[in-house]
């Protein structure tokens, strides 16, 4: 039995009080009365034993009211044992009962004659029973059948009886007992020799009242059977509220303690979206018209933000939709204001420095309500004599810091042609521009460049060498910017300081340098001069004289280059005239779907044009390395960490610091120790390939380390790594326009390689590297081969046993091992699909053989989610079975440029097209091996409604069904175009499955 405390001492603990005050502010507990003799005026009729013990009498209270009480005062004789028993009291569901006693006791000290036998206490008992069994004998009048509650002592006593009969010096005590398990109980009061009066008895139990708090309604709940009991009560969310998703909670609950007080809340309800709290969390009220609440919670409704309104003129809105011409970007919250596209940049101006142009402008007057304004630069070359024939600037034009996504209000444009009229458009865009049907606003300015110095000469070739001389030749500058008057050659011994250099002037693009030392490595640079002055020096090239005693050699296989060099000046004039006539002729031709009146890439295919040279054609592979790759002193390189591994060794991140120049980050491939001569040649072969390329969308070779260990290939460092893994990490974070910009860069790099008669053979997103400015560059030239310059059949036939990346490779390359620039175009289409699907694996989990079979059945990949139709159509063009029908990279670049200029073309999604569509693969085709008949197949593709049509036509076996055509479907009564297409697509997959059951020759 628990200990009892006085009512005056009962207090709520500190934590409970804090909870009550700060969390719920609940009302006080309820008392349910089971028995109350307070103010009783008629006979109560309780049973006493012995009869001369307790007696029921009438007295007056302090308000002069006549009340019935029980009293006993048998102190004269020792051994008193007087019992008073109540009637049977039903507990009415109570688990714990409280008894409040009003009584008075006479002070034993005031009765000296009986002081030794006098008591000032009495004892309270209870006895449980399912039925009323009371009689004069039962329950028995001793402690055995009774349960003691407590011995009650008076706090105050009186010394003499009031002559008026009033009750004096009243005591009030509360005791409790439980848990109760039977239908009812009796109370008994035992006197052992006191002189006292039992004025009133109240029997009650506590209940926690019904309450609505925290948007939940809790019913009236009885207190538990113990003082420390917590009775759980499950609440119900009020109207328009729902249970909050609190971790670990299951339902909304309160707990009723033994004193009838609510405490220990778990879970809670919150107002639904479109509703807010009213009446101190008593109810949820719909948001007024013109306001909204987007999510479940206790937040109030908010007024619709700027440029938005509630979708319906009714209360309870969960969102405010944007007004016409205003939008929210994907990164904006639902309560963010709607914003528009920015106006055009202001005060666009330019400054010309030689053939470079510095463009500056001010922010748009109207930013559309956003801070994320960016700028794109559109460059057009406009011949002065033919208005309206502006074409987009070529890839050689450079933009610093970038062309697209500028955050600065300035850009420097370099590598412009001299004496040419240019038009520059500066577009202002933000994150909602692509959501708008309006074209980006832009400012435009016309710029005419003046005559300029020649551009840098891209490379030099060694024609012959001796012990004391070297003969070199070089092509014309890509941009002569006038008539070349002569060339200046600068050279010095690599072992000496650059300040000790010598110069030589040549009127042709070939020179012989005399008086050199045997066996020495010399550094050469060349520059061209026009009437305006000298252009910049070319990059440094390293050539070595013969050792003493070696025979002079001449590269016979380069004889055409020698002849071409001698005739270079005359050839340039002829080529220029041909190029002008070609441009005029092309401008009059009918526009193709890919050109869009853009400038065509002019390849003279003659003297001075740079070609790719296969390193394997060199008798000495080291000669190719010396010619195409710059040797780097190992002391200039600092390796900081390993970032990967490759076939030949590790890939590292490091820094390169040339004397007198700034340090910059590089990627370093190292050749593992224990390599063979063949492995060394293969490892360095990639460097001799890369060293021939110079394009902003092709990985740049810094140089090689071959004179120390380990052997290294040093390239520029691409911060974001391979394109496929980068896209998977950033899934959904780029706009369609940004993805198209990446694709355009890849296509530009491949156009450059194709123009050099170079076939990549392994073009895939994994072999595209991405830098911090999202510039994509073609890399990994391990599988690449030289493309012979045969216009009728420019192919390379690979070795019969070489490994081929099936998912990226054109069918003719898989079947016949024939690789061409057209097969690279097929691979580029797969790269497009990878980019638009954020790095998803092409053909998903299909086996290589399934891929081969599907392509042979004319199946093609479907558009990735949200892929613009125009991009998927371009992919399908790249996947034409006849390689002659595939577009050239030049046309692909033009098509992507058109999309970038008109972003509205990128908004349409889906596979619809005006031209006949090819069957498209599905990521989840029917599992044909598990299907046994036509009915199961129709159910699998959700076309079960046509079972009867197939049955009546006798179309039962897959072999017969696989030969059905569109006319057959129409004949058996399938007329809905969408259903026809769905069934035909599945029939194509059925064909692939049936073909897999037969041996396939690859």
UniProtKB/Swiss-Prot annotation:
Keyword Signal (UniProt): yes
Domain Fibronectin type-III positions: 344-452, 453-548
Active-site residues, as the UniProt record annotates them: 762
Glycosylation sites: 446
Enzyme Commission code(s) on record: 2.7.10.1
Cleavable signal peptide: 1-29
Record topological domains on the Extracellular side: 30-564
GO MF terms, alphabetically ordered: ATP binding; transmembrane-ephrin receptor activity
Domain Eph LBD: 31-213
Pfam families per the UniProt record, alphabetical: EphA2_TM, Ephrin_lbd, Ephrin_rec_like, fn3, PK_Tyr_Ser-Thr, SAM_2
GO cellular component, one term: plasma membrane
Motif PDZ-binding location, chain numbering: 1000-1002
Bias type Polar residues, positions: 910-928
Any Gene Ontology biological process: ephrin receptor signaling pathway
Keyword Membrane: yes
Binding site for ATP: 643-651, 669
Entry similarity comment: Belongs to the protein kinase superfamily. Tyr protein kinase family. Ephrin receptor subfamily.
Protein's UniProt name: Ephrin type-B receptor 5
Origin species: Gallus gallus
